[in-house]
């Protein structure tokens, strides 16, 4: 339907179907998270991931147990469109979308094999578009772009977001000038927490009545992330 086509095509953090756009309600319509409404390490305000951004998580050491937790999250949360409220007159769905231009990831010689395995899994198994960048060659990485931090900042304009996993000082000012958000958090051992950071959160609010009649009006289907 037209509504479903619109929901799959429009690029925004909050979508409103057959209703006004006044929202920003905790849990029901969390806000932000897209484009210039997202700066640094953040998540939708009032959403399921927001509290997790307010604490530090231990850095990952082993890929396989982290992947197991990430896989479980993808099955039970990430791949679905979830309505936490269950109202009969309105759907308030939370789902995840892919970055259209992908993420530019800064790594270094000290980046562990387990971290590289995670980045490879994101790209090859989940279809997350990433490009790896470093200031020097790293053995075994054929698709690595070797460049300075200044060159990195210029190339970042081609991407939606930056993930900085290097001990270097990131060119935050240059990135901010170009409207590019930079996430400097290390990869965490919590797979369910970490994998959500590589997707966009989206809230979709759909009116399910016509003048108070819950059996009238369009009933568009809102799908979750295609994995």
Feature-to-residue mapping (PLM):
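Conserved C-terminal structural/oligomerization subdomain of aldehyde/semialdehyde dehydrogenase
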Residues: 1-227
